[in-house]
Amino acid sequence: MSAIMRIHAREVLDSRGNPTIQIEVESEYGYGSAMVPSGASTGEKEAKELRDKGTKYEKNWYGGKGVQTAVDNVNNIIAPKIEGYDVLDQRAIDYEMIKLDGTEFKEKLGANAILGVSLAVAKAAADELNIPLYRYVGGTNGFKLPVPMLNVINGGEHASNTVDFQEFLIMPIGAKTFKEAMQVANKVFHNLKDLLASQGHSTAVGDEGGFAPDLKSHEEVLDFIVSAIKKAGYEPSKKGDKAVAIAIDAASSELFDKKSKTYTFKKLKKAILTKQPGFENLGKVKVEYSSDELVEYFKDLFKKYPIISLEDGFSEHDWDAFTKLNNSVGATHQIMGDDLVTTNPKFIKKAIETKAINSVLIKLNQIGTLSETMDAIEMAHKAGMTCVVSHRSGETEDTTIADLAVALNTGQIKTGSISRTDRVAKYNRLLVIEEELGIVASYEGIQVFHNLKVK
């Protein structure tokens, strides 16, 4: 047994300049540190991060967004309870914190407080054993490098532009190694920048490092991406050695009106109504959709473009629409739930029963402990679903999710573009892991979609 000797929390800053929490854990022979990210578009069923609004710390940071209350909870409540535990007893530690909080969504102590301790404990254990985190969590079975979903154009809550869908991503599925996938991404990203600039569009980037131009439709976004893939010397396709496929995170909960049960492309609508330059003659463009109309809209996009994955195509309250689309195209396309299931086995179980999705996005801070995250992945995998480990829009230089993507054999990772250090840090970590694994390293490419018949 190697006891945990010290747990300490502090406030640090995330990639948006907002406070977040950092946890340090020291055992007799090991040390681990973890920083917790936060999201901009969040599911209602996520575990709750604790912020300082309404507390005595409210004025410490802009908008009451400090996390000193969560820091206090770690230092004064969690630490005294967990110090003395064997650092290798991950699940017992996680369960003890869940019990200590006592609420379904961890709103008492804060999911940010609990997750930070959970991850720092795992990293301290790995350090104690003198092995990397992916080896500690995954054992000898952690050898698959994930296919990256690389954000190339930001919209929605992640950018101040006219694009309503939150993320447009590329997937280098024809690559043979993770390093080659990064080389593909590098070429497509910079060719996209050149194409945007050549047509007078902004090449400033959004929260996750993708470009954030004012474009007139989602189709125009996709046309630019297809052109960039071709200009880089690859094929916008779902098959072949040169294939680069496209993925979309629509984040449609942000577009949904609960009363009317309709979806509105709000940013495009505003640009048209205010006659933003270039949008003056778009008055007849459709900006409002019923659930059924949005199902057909996505199916039409799937026919026109090499899209292989769609995340949160509908609101987290619109389960029927998810099921309808999945029943229609789920055999050939990855239909992924984020806000719908929030990395929670309770909601993943419902998604399995209703056949709403065939893939689960995995965000550790949606559920709040490493053990529960592993349970969510196991449940999804047993049901034949794919899983994608994901960052959040408010990130840090912490690279834990890179190790976990390998350790847990998810096969896919979504962690932003190849700009902004908070995003690139994860890719750099994966490049190191691939080199460490040597000849046993595996990059599956298109084969990662084991549950699809890709056409």
From Swiss-Prot:
Residues binding (2R)-2-phosphoglycerate, per UniProt: Q166, K363, R392, S393, K414
CC cofactor note: Binds a second Mg(2+) ion via substrate during catalysis.
Binding of Mg(2+), residues: D249, E311, D338
Main subcellular location of this protein, as a coarse class: cytoplasm
Cellular component terms per the entry's GO annotation: cell surface; extracellular region; phosphopyruvate hydratase complex
Named cofactor requirement(s): Mg(2+)
Keywords: Cytoplasm, Glycolysis, Lyase, Magnesium, Metal-binding, Secreted
Any one Gene Ontology BP term: glycolytic process
Superkingdom of origin organism: Bacteria
Enzyme nomenclature, EC number: 4.2.1.11
Alphabetized InterPro entries for the sequence: Enolase (IPR000941), Enolase-like_C_sf (IPR036849), Enolase-like_N (IPR029017), Enolase_C (IPR020810), Enolase_CS (IPR020809), Enolase_N (IPR020811)
Pfam families: Enolase_C, Enolase_N
Function: Catalyzes the reversible conversion of 2-phosphoglycerate (2-PG) into phosphoenolpyruvate (PEP). It is essential for the degradation of carbohydrates via glycolysis.
HAMAP family according to UniProt: Enolase
Protein name: Enolase
